[in-house]
Amino acid sequence: MSRVGRVERTTKETSVVVEIDLDGTGKVDVSTGVGFFDHMLDQLGRHGLFDLTVKTDGDLHIDSHHTIEDTALALGAAFKQALGDKVGIYRFGNCTVPLDESLAQVTVDLSGRPYLVHTEPENMAPMIGAYDTTMTRHILESFVAQAQIALHVHVPYGRNAHHIVECQFKALARALRHASERDPRATGILPSTKGAL
């Protein structure tokens, strides 16, 4: 059974199309107009082994906020759609990823309940090129709200802002991959004592 999600989101500020295949091989084709954000989405697809297509046309003449936010919302909705009924998945996933001096620890529960805990070092550089580093938390908030997952992201240390953000996306990719993969020992079983996720 194919586990593909496709979402189109159009507002007066942006036009977004996202397609994700959870059982892909990491083929990525992304274009948002925000170079560093594209780089992070590439990390998400490649390290999650998700086939990911993202096409966003946003009001970048204002700034990148709407473009990034709406893309993250559409990505979360597409991820939820691709998960389907969640029967037979592992549900939980975690990963710790270093990037030189930075470290990210990510744990996810595909619970159906949106919740984010996010910590990263204080006094980070405010910008990476045209990317506002305060947007990382907002990306995660937007994704979590639409995907309806519980997500804990902790960066206990790091100095380089690029590394701090990138290791979060790499760890998120691996944690989502592990949580969404099918468990061969749980075929046909929903991983919940409630009977619903």
Can you annotate each of these PLM segments?
Residues 1-197:
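Structural preference for solvent-exposed beta-strand-turn elements
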